[in-house]
């Protein structure tokens, strides 16, 4: 995350902090400026205009560097102050998450999502607005819990490495990808399954299961603790195992995009291995199946795998009324079993039922 922090500092936060918290010139600088000749100031103006910096610039990666502008030295809050880093990382985590969410969920909605889903008997009234509202509530709160992990990374407490020479070797540069997927898939399976425990579900995980027929905007529409809990394996991994800095940033983006993809309702492949949109739709419809994030491995081993209905892969069948009615009947039974009272308000139903 130090790479992202460096880029954001250079182009956004250095000027912002320099404006809001300008540095006070030291007495040494003030005296030097007073004794300087006009010609010397003209020759080297920055020597007298900029306060003394308490930090030294070191590129976050050897693959590229961004020379700091003058603003990097003009704030009383230097780049290496942990409080500034924490605040900046909070804003990055929050705002970057929002941008990725709206960009990719929006693209998926426009280009991929089948709008016929709006006619499903278990599609909620004003569902997309409700999904966006829940996501907007979750992002800033999740960022609070996430910042300590990113701050620890930036301050050198993790096993993140920059170049191959700094890591275990070239072999690990390739192995870290399936290793990361396998580790996080295992952990998320058990975390997700734990969120379905009756003592936890109604308080934490139920908001995400409000969406029986999710749209791409349901991807991040969950309780903040729910989202943070399922993100923990990603944050923990670089403190347990080596991970390249570039891979860390790439995984951060990929995971957010993947979360959108498994909620887009486009059943592109009927894979027995990949836990794609079809498998995750089964989870939203039938609750207690397909807890995995990337693969079906742990669901198969844990006895919670449910093969997606064949009808999902045939458009003329997946959108037919008979299939929808069958799904609605099964959903109602599961809702009664898992939640008891159903407080959802479905499209086409009278206003007597309100989604809370």
UniProtKB/Swiss-Prot annotation:
A Gene Ontology BP annotation from the UniProt entry: sterol biosynthetic process
Named cofactor requirement(s): Fe cation
GO CC terms of this entry: endoplasmic reticulum membrane
Family: Belongs to the sterol desaturase family.
Motif Histidine box-2, residue range(s) on this chain: 205-209
Motif (Histidine box-1): 192-196
Subcellular location: Endoplasmic reticulum membrane
A Pfam family annotated for this UniProt entry: FA_hydroxylase
Domain Fatty acid hydroxylase: 179-303
EC number(s) from the headed UniProt entry: 1.14.19.20
Motif range (Histidine box-3): 280-284
Superkingdom, taxonomy of origin: Eukaryota
Membrane topology, as annotated: Multi-pass membrane protein
Entry protein name: Delta(7)-sterol 5(6)-desaturase
Pathway: Steroid metabolism; ergosterol biosynthesis; ergosterol from zymosterol: step 3/5
Catalysed reactions, semicolon-separated: a Delta(7)-sterol + 2 Fe(II)-[cytochrome b5] + O2 + 2 H(+) = a Delta(5),Delta(7)-sterol + 2 Fe(III)-[cytochrome b5] + 2 H2O
Keywords carried by this UniProt record: Endoplasmic reticulum, Iron, Lipid biosynthesis, Lipid metabolism, Membrane, Oxidoreductase, Steroid biosynthesis, Steroid metabolism, Sterol biosynthesis, Sterol metabolism, Transmembrane, Transmembrane helix
Gene name tied to this protein: ERG3
Purpose: May contribute to the regulation of ergosterol biosynthesis.
Recorded GO MF terms: delta7-sterol 5(6)-desaturase activity; iron ion binding
Species, as recorded: Leptosphaeria maculans (Blackleg fungus)
Domain notes: The histidine box domains may contain the active site and/or be involved in metal ion binding.
Transmembrane segments: 87-107, 134-154, 171-191, 235-255
